[in-house]
Design a protein with these regions (language model features):
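N-terminal short beta-loop-beta anion/metal-coordinating cradle
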Residues: 1-91
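Gly/Ser/Thr-rich loops at beta-strand to alpha-helix junctions
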Residues: 23-29, 94, 124-128, 163, ...
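Conserved active-site and cofactor/substrate-binding residues in soluble primary-metabolism enzymes
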Residues: 28-32, 98-102, 164, 168, ...
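Hydrophobic/aromatic beta-strand patches that form the interior of the parallel beta-sheet core
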Residues: 47, 86-88, 118-120, 179-184
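Internal, conserved structured core segments that host functional sites
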Residues: 94-145
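Secondary-structure boundary elements
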Residues: 106-119, 175-179, 207-212
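Catalytic cores of processing enzymes, dominated by hydrolases/peptidases
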Residues: 128-207
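Extended, histidine- and acidic-residue-enriched regions that form the cofactor-binding/catalytic faces
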Residues: 179-257
Length: 257
């Protein structure tokens, strides 16, 4: 494999869909949100993306079979006659600068093929969120930005970089004449963060005007918060032990003259 390829297993019958992208990143916010959407909407997989820019290993199943790392496209036909969706997530982001650009370009070409006019990218925004994580937004156009702000998002601070596919798609979308908006959930970043993903989905469902049952994330949020509390206690214990060791060492200091 010399370059990124997209293989379709079936044709998706969609009417000017919105494409939602959520690859692994800070706090896995994008992947958690997109996977939850796929499950809630019962979206159907219709294409896969393979790339030599993904990490060089295969995944092994419980039965011992293997598969390459990949990205997956899912389609959802809105029975209410409103916005159809293409949802894209995957096992990894590209591990090279060239790969990030190449995969973003392939995604945009694929979006163009299905007459996508708007793309929503989802990711994490590193921040110590105390209570409810905020959603930070950046967009290629004022209308999309205003829609997100009305839905509860806050405009990204000037100069803040959006790293990876979530950001590059925004930057490259204008060359394909596609509008794009990025929703970033505040997250500590070092653990999977379903709470940040839920905040993003609350904004997204308002923008898309679809009803989602987000209570399924509450159990995952509780598990994540228990893990954070456990790690904080471990860190506090480590610091306390370090202080005690330092005190003991100070007592043992002798001066030789």
């Amino acid at each position: 494999m010399k370059e990124t390829v997209i293989k379709e297993t079936s044709k998706a019958d969609l009417d000017n869909p919105i494409l939602i992208e959520g690859l692994p990143g800070l706090g896995l916010v994008g992947k958690i949100a997109t996977r939850y959407l796929i499950k809630q909407l019962k979206a159907e997989r219709f294409a896969s993306l393979y790339s030599p820019h993904f990490p060089y290993f295969v995944l092994v199943s419980k039965k011992g079979s293997i598969r390459l790392l990949s990205g997956a496209f899912y389609s959802w036909k809105n029975k209410a006659g409103k916005t159809d969706l293409i949802l894209f997530t995957g096992d990894s982001q590209a591990q090279t600068i060239e790969g990030q650009y190449e995969i973003s370009d392939r995604l945009l070409d694929f979006a163009k093929k299905y007459r996508v006019r708007t793309i929503v990218t989802i990711g994490g925004y590193r921040m110590e969120a105390k209570d409810k994580p905020k959603v930070i937004v950046a967009a290629t156009g004022q209308e999309l930005l205003d829609d997100a702000v009305r839905a509860g998002a806050s405009v990204s601070p000037a100069g803040s970089p959006i790293v990876g596919t979530a950001g590059l798609i925004l930057g490259m979308a204008r060359f394909k004449k596609i509008e794009a908006v990025c929703l970033l959930g505040e997250t500590r970043g070092y653990l999977p963060d379903p709470k940040a993903a839920k905040s993003v989905l609350e904004v997204l469902q308002s923008i898309l005007k679809i009803d989602l049952d987000l209570t399924g994330l509450d159990e995952e949020i509780a598990k994540a918060e228990k893990m954070v509390t456990r790690l904080q206690k471990i860190e506090e214990k480590r610091v306390s032990q370090a202080v005690e060791i330092r005190k003991e060492e100070d007592k043992k200091i002798t001066y030789i003259s």
